[in-house]
């Protein structure tokens, strides 16, 4: 693992999310960090987006009182969402599935907003839309292995044409002779082992409850978050721009088209919360995070957005526990997965 070998060579580490994909590898990172004393930063850019930071501020300032429950719904559309089923992510042994690879962002946000960590997780998950069997149920008859060179792919809305995208062609198609990696698999193949429909229940250590859903075949991309407390409710709605990963337009990755945070006081009129807009990927979070990563401590951060390996591992453990719950049909105690 690159994180571990870097620390063993005496380096501090900056890593993308997810920090890893299962509890065994997470424990190895914990042990290596203790042994080497090196520092790990996890690049959780969503923490730095102004609208996400605003939620932490509202909760911190007691605007809705003590938080009791959260409902978090994430929607992936058939551009970005479908892309996970073309690539290496379609194999759960590689990616941990979307509950680890994608939802680590969302689970980290909840940990960050509430200042807590998961205690117990229960989940359901199925592959209902993607995959050959599901396509056959809908009457699809023309199947193909990959888009490149396939006549059947030309009429498929879900096919990705790397020949006509210079960035994808150079990065993947032209490199196949060296890498052996095929980037444009059919999303209706018969060897997909990740889910596309997921529902998760989480009890946190501070007794807050969360219901979470993730679906990856929907007409629009974005999320709805509802946070309920002793003095009111926050409703947070966002629509994001769809994109193809590594498709050449970096600024659109996670870029927000529209968003609104609305507070509903228990007594009084609801109101929309003003948010300062910052240009950049992931809702304006990328430039703020990069400044913090490469100039740490230049400015004091009242929201403590910098994430270390402990934050990174706690974010994946919700998804790891959810995967175990889907497989076993039982609730999972998160504290049994690793030792910090």
State what each model feature region is.
Residues 152-211, 216-220, 238-240:
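Contiguous C-terminal substrate-recognition/catalytic subdomains in enzyme active sites
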Residues 20-21, 47, 77, 219, ...:
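Glycine-/small-residue-rich active-site loops that bind phosphorylated ligands and cofactors
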């Amino acid at each position: 693992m690159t994180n571990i070998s870097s620390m063993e060579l005496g380096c501090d580490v900056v890593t993308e999310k997810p920090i890893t994909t299962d509890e065994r590898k997470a424990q190895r990172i914990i042990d290596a960090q203790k042994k080497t004393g090196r520092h790990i930063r996890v690049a959780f850019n969503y923490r730095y987006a102004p609208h996400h930071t605003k939620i932490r501020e509202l909760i911190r300032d007691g605007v809705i009182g003590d938080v009791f429950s959260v409902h978090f719904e994430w929607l992936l559309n058939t551009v970005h969402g479908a892309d996970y089923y073309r690539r290496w992510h379609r194999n759960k042994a590689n990616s941990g599935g979307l509950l680890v690879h994608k939802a680590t962002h969302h689970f980290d946000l909840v940990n960050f907003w509430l200042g807590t960590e998961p205690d117990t997780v229960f989940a359901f998950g199925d592959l209902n839309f993607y995959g050959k069997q599901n396509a056959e149920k809908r009457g699809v008859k023309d199947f193909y292995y990959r888009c490149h060179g396939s006549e059947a792919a030309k009429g498929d809305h879900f096919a990705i044409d790397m020949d006509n995208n210079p960035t994808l062609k150079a990065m993947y198609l032209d490199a196949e002779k060296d890498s052996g990696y095929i980037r444009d698999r059919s999303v209706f193949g018969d060897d997909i082992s990740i889910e596309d429909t997921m529902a998760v229940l989480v009890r946190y250590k501070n007794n807050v409850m969360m219901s979470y859903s993730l679906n990856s075949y929907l007409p629009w991309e974005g999320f709805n978050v509802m946070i309920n407390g002793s003095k009111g409710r926050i409703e947070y709605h966002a629509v994001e721009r769809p994109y193809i990963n590594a498709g050449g337009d970096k600024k659109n990755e996670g870029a927000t088209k529209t968003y609104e945070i609305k507070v509903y006081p228990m007594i009084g009129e609801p109101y929309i919360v003003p948010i300062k807009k910052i240009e950049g990927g992931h809702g304006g979070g990328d430039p703020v995070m990069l400044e913090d990563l490469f100039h740490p401590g230049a400015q004091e951060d009242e929201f403590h957005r910098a994430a270390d390996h402990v934050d990174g591992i706690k974010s994946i453990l919700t998804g790891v526990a959810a995967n175990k719950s889907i497989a076993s049909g039982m609730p999972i105690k998160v504290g049994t997965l690793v030792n910090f």
